[in-house]
Structures are given as C-alpha cells and as structure tokens.
C-alpha cells in the first residue's frame, strides 16, 4: 500500500528507493509487483517518491512530460536507501573501466600514490576517486556515466559474500545515465542509484527505463548472472574471428608521429615482424600510418609516400601475414581535424557534437614540446556523413589488405547532448548511446559480407558495442595492470582493479590491459594472464623501436621533446630487456598451448573451487569444451608458496610457463603462474 503525502509517497521499510526529478513537469511512475502494475502520477514542484523494495517487486519504470513553455534540462534520480556496510565483509562492485572492487571503507581522507582511493566530500561522506578527472564537490556523488569507459555496464552490487543488493538499469537502448555512489562513514552505509539526465523541449516525453533494485542471496557472481540474463534477452556478442584463438595481446606501433617523425616505414615491416614475434605476439596494429601521422588530418587516411607509398604498404602487409601475423590498422572513431582537411571543409564542419550555445565539442592534442598540436571536433555518431565516412575508411583499409580496423576513443566516450538537428536527432538528444551502437553495427555488417573474419577494435570497452566490436584495447590511464591486480594485497587499498567482474559477466570479451612503455615485466605478464586480460604492447617513438629490437636503453634525452612520456622509462634497461622479452613470449606461448581453456574457455572467476596456502595468491577458473577446466594460480609473492587446489573434477596435470608439466604438490616459485587442469567439471 502506498500512502500519499503532500510532496512525497512515503513508507516504513529498511530499504527503499527514491526518485527526485527537478523542474515543473508531469510525471508518472509504474511500480511492478507480482505481475501487476500500479501507476502513480503527479505534477508540480520538485519532490521525492519513496517506495519500499517490497512494493517494487520486479522493478519500475517512468515517464516525464515537459508542460513548461520552452525546453528544460533536468535529471531524474533513482536511488536506494543506504545499505549497511559490514567492515571486513562488505564489498562494493562497480563497472568502472575493467571493474572495481571496494573493500576497505575509509574513516578519513587518504591518499597514496598509484592507488585509487576515496575522496572526502564533506564530513563523513566519501565518493570513490575513480580518476584524476573526478571533480565532484560538496555532497554530490561521483558520477559514473554509462555507456562509457567510466561505467561499462548498467549494474553494480554491494555484497558481503553471502548476500547482496543489486542495482541495474534494464535499458536496451543504452540511454544516458550515471551510476552514483556515496559512502557515509558515520552511519557506515552506502547509497547507490542512477541519475537519468535529459533535455526536454516543450511537450516532449522522456521514458525512464526499467530500474531493478533487489536483495539477493549469494556472492557478487549472482548479480552478474542476473545482469547477463537480461543482456542476452536483447543483445548478442559479435562473431569472433578465428584469429581470436591466438590472441594473447597485440604489438601496436605508431609508424609516424604527430610531428612527422617516422619510427617504422612500410619498407621495414620485416624487422617489425621480427620484433613482434620475438615478444610472443601474433597480432600487430598500426597507428600513425597515413600521410598526416598520428593525431593529424583525421578522418583522412592515405598511404604515405614518405614511408614507402601504397605499393610498399600493401606488400609489407602481405609479408607480415605470410609469417602468421594478423594485421590491423588505426582510425579515430570520433575526432576530425578542425579545418585541416578537405573532408572537414566539405562535410565535417556539420558533423560535430554541438552545444546549446552553438559551439562545437572539441579536443586539443599536443604530443611534442616543439609542435603546436592539433584541435579536433568530436563528431556526432548520429551524423549521416560521419557514419558514412567511418564505413568508407574501413572499406579502404580492407582493400589495402588489413584484417581488422581499430576505432580509437569510440568505446570510452560518455553521452553528451547534441543540439544540431542536421544529425537526425532532436536538439538536445544525448548522443554516444544507441547511435554509437548502430553506427558500428552498420560497419561490421558491411565488412563481414565480404570477409566474415574481419574484426573491429575499440579503445575501451562498454557493453553496448559487444555486438559489433571483437577486440578491445583497455584504458586505465596508462598504468600497469599487473601491478594493479597485485594491489589487492596492499594494506589499506580502498579500490582495487577487479577485471573478474567484467569477464565473469562477459566471458567472451577479449580485452587488453594498457601500458605506454615498450616492455612488459614478469609481474605484468602474470597479472594479465590470471585476470584474463591480454597484453597491450606499444611502440610509439624511435627510442622505443631501438629498445624492442635490440635492447638499447634510451638515452637521457631520448624523450625530452615528448609531453606525455612513457610511464616506466626507468625499467627500460639493457640488462633486463632480453629476460622481459623472453618471459612475455613464454607466457604467450603457454596461454596459446592451453588456449582451449585460457583463451577460448568460459571465464568463471573464483567459482566452484578453493585454494589454500600462500600469502599472495590470485586464482581464477576457465571452463573449456569437452569437460575441461583450468584453474590458473599466480603466486604473486616474492617467495615460493605451497598451494593446494580443490575442485570437483578429475585432476589431469599441473603446468607452468617455464618448466612445463610439474608435480602439483611442488612449491610454486615466486612470481610464477601454474595451471591446474581437471576433467569432467561439475555443473555450477
């Protein structure tokens, strides 16, 4: 029973949800319960509605109509009443970048270099400090905008290992929304919810998508399964190419930089192939491959005579492919050089995301101290000319012989309102939502007509583009993923990277970590493997090439002109080059050898097995076909560890990258992976 008061609908219950639209609007709320619906309507001043979780039942949805004269911008908040946090048990799981798990709850402001922590906003109130761009102030929660790199999925959960609270938006059109989280350290409670931003012209309607808030029994994996069941009801994962079975990471090379400096011309692709294979890669991808180099002249990409021209490029691609390498190429999925191309002058100027004041949404990229950089408009994915150009450049790349096409930035961008009606949407519509998804679906549909194995890449993952994009370059502010996975052992860490959340929800997902230094340490290679991440390996500058080819440590001034230098230059030592290179290749070969499990298997995280022993052990499970199960264990400690693995199948073997098959009872050496293989898995 819902009781109406002057400005709210209130109840008495331990858990509730509140909706707070702002502005003079007419609204309605549909509350589901036991298959029936109750519709509540009202109009007037800002207000709040409180409804018990018992009343919600399956979920709710809503409708807002602007009856004001003129347009209004407003937000519609849906949030659960504060959920109790049990110190030492409760963890908050957020779909941030790779996935975030928050386990340690703060009592005061804490900062620690290299570790994502909480940010105090006012007395006893904290928000997760998810990025250096988090500018939350006062009591406003830190927004995680979906769909984007900051909120890759429409769900989150608070769980104590036995039960949890599930928050999800079941919105098949992937409309703009923010996941909001606030922690009150005095009450020891966390508040979770959604905000739906909107721009409503007079007389128009906004439909609030279905929101689910419910308590459940089980671990965080139960919440992941609930979300995946809904996702499967309205979407599907794109066909993955056969090359996915060998994909342990990719060797990315910027052939020509923004300032015109050439690091690797087309005529020297043979040595590029040597370096890629020596590091264990079967996939290469080229940035800065056109006349303009990297971060200029977008979206025009023409083979560069200075690097050898079209003939040399086509021949070089064929030679790489003859050696078993899969070759892909770069474009930017949203940037267009402002006034710098024929494209912009003829069509691009009318494709930009346009603000309410008529100014365009833009970015300025400057890579070198001796170069002015370039300004780009952000293109609207609804604009017909932009959509046509994104398909055209992909078709052009396929004609050159490329097997995959990389759209930079396309997965990371968060929704923004665009006011240019020439794009086919109403003024103020939030773009980078369903329009991004359909643009990429149109591209992959055309590409796979002639080559079913053609694959699209994206920088950054979000689940709206899983039906078109096969490979993802991760985006984690260029930090070392192996180190961050190991961060879960660092005392006092509030937030740790938790890729298990994302990969358990979408075990088909193929995504790399992110690192801007031309090396991969042993720790990083192991951390990526156990977390189901592939390895991102980037060669950006001439000094990078010298290091990956022959171990020549960079001179002190090698990166002097560069504004954003590689983050781990100090590790680029001649004496460790060969060991790092060879170990990365060893782990890559190991993952391919057991690829039916570790690369093509279904990622199950920590489900259905237990591990005892060791102080710093991370272990995850994969199920292959034909009843095979693999449990990969990483001893992240600097000393050997005695470890035992319990699983309900028949033990087959234990194997390590360097030593091959080993006795399962042997100590696992320091910073070493071990795969325990079983047969006839139990149903879970």
Protein language model features and the residues they cover:
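Conserved structural scaffold segments of CAZyme catalytic domains across common CAZy folds
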Residues: 71-74, 121-328, 332-343, 576, ...
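Active-site-proximal substrate-binding groove within the catalytic cores of carbohydrate-active enzymes
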Residues: 31, 203-204, 208, 435-657, ...
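Active-site-adjacent "subsite" loops/lids of carbohydrate-active enzymes
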Residues: 261-264, 312-313, 318, 328-400, ...
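Aromatic- and acidic-residue-enriched carbohydrate-binding clefts of CAZyme catalytic domains
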Residues: 290-313, 342-381, 413-438, 443
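Polysaccharide-binding surfaces and accessory modules of carbohydrate-active proteins
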Residues: 27-42, 47-179
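Hydrophobic h-region of N-terminal signal peptides that target proteins for export
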Residues: 13-21
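Bacterial N-terminal signal peptides that target proteins for export
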Residues: 1-10
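Active-site neighborhood of glycoside hydrolase catalytic domains
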Residues: 377-469, 480-485
């Amino acid at each position: 029973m819902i009781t109406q008061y002057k400005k709210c609908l209130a109840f008495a219950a331990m858990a509730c949800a509140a909706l707070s639209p702002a502005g003079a609007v007419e609204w309605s709320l549909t509350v589901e319960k036991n298959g029936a619906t109750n519709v509540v309507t009202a109009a007037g001043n800002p207000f709040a509605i409180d409804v018990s979780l018992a009343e919600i039942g399956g979920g709710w949805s809503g409708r807002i109509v602007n009856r004001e004269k003129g347009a209004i911008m407003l937000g519609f908040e849906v949030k659960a009443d504060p959920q109790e946090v049990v110190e030492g048990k409760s963890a908050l799981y957020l779909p941030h970048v790779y996935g975030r798990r928050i386990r340690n709850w703060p009592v005061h402001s804490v900062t620690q270099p290299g570790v994502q922590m909480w940010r105090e906003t006012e007395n006893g109130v904290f928000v997760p400090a998810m990025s250096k761009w988090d500018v939350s102030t006062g009591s406003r929660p830190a927004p995680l905008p979906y769909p984007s790199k900051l909120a890759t999925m429409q769900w989150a959960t608070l769980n104590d290992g036995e039960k949890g609270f599930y928050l999800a938006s079941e919105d098949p059109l992937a409309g703009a929304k923010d996941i909001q989280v606030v922690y009150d350290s005095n009450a020891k409670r966390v508040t979770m919810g959604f905000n739906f931003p909107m721009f409503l012209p007079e007389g128009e309607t906004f439909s609030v998508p279905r929101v689910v808030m419910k308590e459940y029994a089980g671990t965080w994996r139960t919440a992941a399964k609930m979300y995946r069941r809904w996702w499967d009801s309205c979407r599907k994962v794109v066909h993955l190419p056969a090359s996915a079975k060998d994909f342990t990471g990719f060797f990315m090379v910027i052939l020509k930089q923004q300032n015109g400096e050439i690091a690797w011309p087309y005529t020297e692709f043979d040595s590029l192939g040597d370096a890629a294979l020596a590091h264990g890669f079967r996939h290469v991808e080229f940035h800065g491959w056109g006349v303009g180099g990297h971060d200029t002249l977008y979206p025009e990409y023409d083979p560069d005579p200075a690097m050898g021209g079209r003939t040399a490029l086509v021949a070089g691609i064929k030679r790489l492919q003859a050696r078993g390498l899969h070759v892909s190429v770069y474009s930017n999925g949203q940037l267009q050089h402002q006034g710098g191309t024929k494209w912009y002058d003829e069509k691009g100027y009318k494709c930009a995301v346009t603000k309410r004041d008529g100014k365009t949404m833009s970015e300025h990229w400057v890579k070198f101290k001796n170069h002015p950089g370039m300004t780009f408009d952000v293109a609207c994915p609804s604009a017909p000319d932009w959509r046509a150009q994104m398909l055209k450049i992909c078709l052009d790349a396929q004609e050159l012989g490329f097997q995959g096409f990389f759209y930079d930035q396309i997965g990371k961008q968060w929704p923004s309102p665009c006011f240019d009606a020439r794009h086919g949407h109403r003024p103020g519509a939030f773009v980078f939502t369903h329009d991004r998804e359909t643009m990429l679906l149109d591209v992959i549909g055309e590409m796979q007509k002639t080559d079913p194995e053609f694959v699209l890449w994206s920088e950054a993952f979000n689940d709206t583009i899983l039906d078109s994009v096969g490979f993802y370059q991760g985006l984690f502010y260029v930090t070392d993923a192996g180190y961050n996975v190991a961060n879960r052992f660092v005392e006092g860490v509030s937030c740790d990277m938790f890729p298990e959340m994302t990969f358990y929800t979408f075990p088909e997902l193929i995504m790399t970590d992110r690192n801007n230094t031309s090396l991969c340490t042993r720790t990083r290679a192991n951390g990526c493997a156990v977390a189901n991440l592939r390895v991102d390996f980037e060669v950006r500058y001439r000094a990078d090439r010298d290091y990956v080819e022959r171990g020549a440590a960079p001179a002190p001034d090698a990166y002097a002109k560069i504004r954003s230098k590689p983050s781990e230059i100090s590790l680029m030592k001649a004496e460790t080059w060969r060991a790092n290179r060879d170990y990365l290749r060893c782990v890559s070969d190991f993952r391919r050898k057991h690829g039916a499990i570790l690369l093509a298997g279904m990622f199950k995280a920590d489900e259905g097995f237990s591990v005892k022993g060791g102080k710093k052990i991370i272990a995850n499970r994969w199920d292959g076909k034909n009843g095979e199960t693999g449990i990969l264990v990483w001893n992240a400690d600097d000393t050997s560890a005695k470890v035992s693995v319990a699983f309900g199948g028949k033990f087959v073997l234990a194997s390590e990258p360097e030593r091959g098959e080993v006795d399962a009872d042997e100590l696992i050496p320091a910073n070493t992976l071990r795969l325990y293989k079983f047969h006839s898995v139990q149903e879970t």
